């Protein structure tokens, strides 16, 4: 089973070197554990501002040295744009072929689905999403949740890309959540009335 561990690119809560020392200790104690490292604020930080490609590469080099083989590139505050995603994905996929990359995009500025699609078309095949786009970010007030699971699966289905995931079940889950769990939702499909806005 994968264990997901989030570490930011900056030094706001803990110095990066300390974070990677902790990570190496976890790796040494649990050598068989599959760790997915969430590289928080990859595309921009609410505290440090712009994050450069060079900073991301340096961070990933430390992750590789710590024995990490799976990393999610996280747009924690929903600031990324498709060109930025495409360029960064191209660089890291070339420089770190031994790392399995995923993408984790927040939909704060309504660019979650296009940024996620850009990552997929750039060669990233694992994505983080949430039903209904539910969620937010505790240190970025106003940030939306991740790209909506059902919105993304609907789009990929329409494009002929098989995800192996049921759009109908995701939609049912998203509507249930919205009715029963007070939260911030950025999804669109769950707001369409049944049998409306359809073809045929």
Outline where the language-model segments fall.
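Single conserved hydrophobic/aromatic residue that forms the stacking wall/gate
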Residues: 1-13
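Catalytic cores and adjacent flexible loops of soluble metabolic enzymes
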Residues: 11-200
């Amino acid at each position: 089973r994968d264990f997901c561990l989030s570490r930011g690119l900056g030094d706001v809560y803990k110095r990066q070197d300390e974070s990677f020392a902790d990570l190496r200790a976890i790796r040494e104690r649990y050598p068989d554990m599959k760790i997915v490292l969430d590289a928080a604020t990859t595309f921009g930080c609410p505290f440090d501002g712009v994050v450069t490609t060079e900073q991301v590469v340096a961070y990933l080099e430390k992750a590789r040295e710590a024995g990490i083989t799976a990393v999610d590139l996280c747009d924690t505050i929903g600031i990324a744009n498709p060109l930025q995603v495409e360029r960064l994905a191209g660089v890291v996929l070339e420089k770190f072929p031994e790392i399995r990359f995923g993408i984790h995009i927040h939909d704060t500025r309504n660019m979650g689905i296009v940024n996620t699609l850009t990552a997929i078309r750039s060669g990233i095949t694992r994505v983080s999403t949430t039903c209904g786009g539910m969620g937010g970010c505790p240190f970025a007030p106003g940030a939306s949740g991740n790209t909506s699971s059902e919105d993304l699966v609907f789009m990929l289905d329409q494009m002929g890309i098989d995800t192996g995931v049921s759009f109908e079940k995701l939609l049912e889950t998203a509507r249930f959540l919205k009715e029963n769990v007070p939260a911030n939702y950025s999804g669109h499909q769950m707001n369409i009335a049944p049998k409306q806005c359809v073809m045929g």
